């Protein structure tokens, strides 16, 4: 047996065999190992899985084929779908060829001169390619028309030299204003030393001119602007007290002049009220007029009317009364409060109980009649179905 294994190994190593496939996976994978004990050509993956199964398989002596290099791993049999794709870089590449070409193309174009720069420079100058790349990729360009080197005085205007005098004695424009108006690039800029009060006065003068143009204000109107330190309004208590005192004095003067007239009017009003309170009827004349028709009162006695208290007449509120008039008999019904004697109330209660009793009795009779009719002709679906009839 040992001789047979050695002979197989010698035959395999001695012959220059062509590339052979794996006997285990039966694929086009190139065999890397030959096992004389199993007499099989195996690839790298199949050799590892077969000879690591148990201790006996691990003892097998295997021969590496010459066709495979010692550092060769398992070859790819099929191409994967993501083969050829590369992961995109997280950060932009520096010194790209496309960017250098773009810089070469743009270098021929004229550039805008830097504001506040030296005249010798003339144009913008790029310090280095790396610096411009960083500014283009990561930063937003900021336009800064002013330079720290040119600002000599904080209170002065930016591009005006110190020799120029800003003040003028007459109303003509100074040198600073002329320089500002002549320079097209700085049209509309305000000198930094201009006070806020001067600016507000200029705005107010412009507003007055607009009001004159629009017709809101006449040219002859001359007004004085009062400067207020605080915004809002204040109530002067002294002025209010003075106004109140004036009103009180006017009222006192009116009372002194027309006091007699007001007192006469009040006295006449009091007399009218007293006469209206002490108004009385001639009950004798009323009774004589109603003598043929009977007494208008239920009890036949004149009640005592108290005008200061409740004016409701309890003698007329409840019950039924027949009052005779010239047209005929008039029936006065009972009041809202349902008042009356105890006998009338008991009679009403008895009538209600009797009505309720008869209603329940009629309902019970109707129920019994329906039940009898249902028993005479039984139905499959219904309440009154006799069980005996269904069983028979």
Curated annotation (Swiss-Prot):
Subcellular localization(s) per the UniProt record: Nucleus
Segments for region (Disordered): 246-271, 326-346
Position of the signal peptide: none
Record: residues binding Zn(2+): 22, 25, 46, 51
Sequence ranges of Basic and acidic residues compositional bias: 259-271
UniProt entry keywords in alphabetical sequence: Coiled coil, Metal-binding, Nucleus, Zinc, Zinc-finger
Name of the protein in its database record: Zinc finger protein CONSTANS-LIKE 7
Residue ranges the record marks as coiled coil: 226-254
Classification via Pfam families: CCT, zf-B_box
UniProt keyword Zinc present: yes
Family, as annotated: Belongs to the CONSTANS family.
Listed GO biological process terms: positive regulation of DNA-templated transcription; regulation of DNA-templated transcription; secondary shoot formation; shade avoidance
Gene name linked to the record: COL7
Record-linked InterPro entries: CCT_domain, CONSTANS-like_Bbox1, CONSTANS-like_ZF, Znf_B-box
């Amino acid at each position: 047996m040992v001789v047979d294994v050695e002979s197989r190994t010698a035959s395999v190593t001695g012959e220059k065999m062509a590339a052979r496939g794996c006997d285990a996976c039966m694929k086009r994978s190139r065999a890397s190992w030959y096992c004389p004990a199993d007499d099989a050509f195996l690839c790298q993956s199949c050799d590892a899985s077969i000879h690591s199964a148990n201790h006996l398989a691990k003892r097998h002596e295997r021969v590496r084929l010459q066709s495979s290099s010692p550092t060769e791993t398992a070859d790819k049999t099929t191409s994967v779908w993501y083969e050829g794709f590369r992961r995109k870089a997280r950060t932009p590449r520096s010194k790209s060829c496309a960017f250098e070409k773009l810089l070469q193309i743009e270098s021929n174009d004229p550039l805008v001169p830097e504001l506040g720069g030296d005249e010798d420079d003339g144009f913008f100058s790029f310090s280095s390619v790396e610096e411009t790349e960083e500014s283009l990729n990561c930063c937003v360009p900021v336009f800064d028309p002013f330079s720290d080197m040119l600002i000599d005085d904080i209170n002065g205007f930016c591009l005006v030299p110190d020799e120029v005098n800003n003040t003028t004695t007459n109303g003509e424009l100074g040198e600073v204003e002329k320089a500002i108006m002549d320079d097209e690039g700085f049209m509309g800029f305000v000198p930094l030393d201009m006070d806020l009060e001067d600016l507000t006065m200029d705005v107010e003068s412009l507003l007055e001119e607009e009001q004159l143009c629009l017709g809101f204000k006449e040219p002859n109107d001359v007004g004085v602007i009062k400067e207020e330190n605080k915004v809002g309004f204040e109530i002067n208590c002294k002025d209010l007290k003075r106004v109140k005192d004036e009103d009180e004095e006017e009222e006192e003067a009116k009372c002194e002049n027309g006091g007699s007239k007001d007192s006469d009017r009040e006295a006449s009003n009091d007399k009218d009220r007293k006469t209206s309170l002490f108004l009385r009827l001639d009950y004798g004349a009323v009774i004589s007029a109603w003598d043929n028709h009977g007494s208008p009162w239920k009890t036949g006695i004149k009640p005592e009317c108290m005008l200061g208290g409740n004016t409701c007449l309890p003698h007329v509120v409840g019950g039924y009364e027949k009052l005779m008039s010239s047209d005929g008999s008039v029936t006065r019904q009972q009041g809202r409060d349902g008042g009356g004697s105890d006998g009338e109330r008991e009679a009403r209660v008895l009538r209600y109980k009797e009505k309720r009793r008869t209603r329940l009795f009629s309902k019970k009779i109707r129920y019994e009649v329906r039940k009898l009719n249902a028993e005479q002709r039984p139905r499959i679906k219904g309440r009154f179905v006799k069980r005996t009839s269904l069983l028979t």
